[in-house]
Amino acid sequence: MKVIDQDLLEKVIIERSRTSHKGDYGRLLLLGGTYPYGGAIIMAALAAVKSGAGLVTVGTDRENIPALHNHLPEAMAFSLQDQQLLKEQLEKEEVVLLGPGLRDNAFGEDIVKQVFASLSQNQILIVDGGAL
């Protein structure tokens, strides 16, 4: 376990170059927000962007995407039901947050299994909420 203290924060939170772009600050994939828990994934995505994550992509129920874009137009989003797109996203992300608002049912269990089977050792997985 890592302790978050002042020294760590000073190393992580740095002034950004005026010529940089969001792609310079990592790629984060958030997976969750299945019915009726869409708000959880939207709040997680907002927190990710506000805390400095670079390219943020959200996999959620299709019905949540308009609300997500209303709060966070810069986020990319796709339907979790699109298994091919989920597979492609899992291959290219650096960090995956799995679980905010993920319903505890067969579909949620399938998503968890797919994520665990797909990630490589150099990717970071954070498990939260319904994925626990």
Language-model features and meaning:
Residues M1-L125:
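Small-residue (G/A/S/T)-rich helix-start motifs and N-terminal tracts that mark the onset
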Residues L132:
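Active-site ligand-binding patch in enzyme domains
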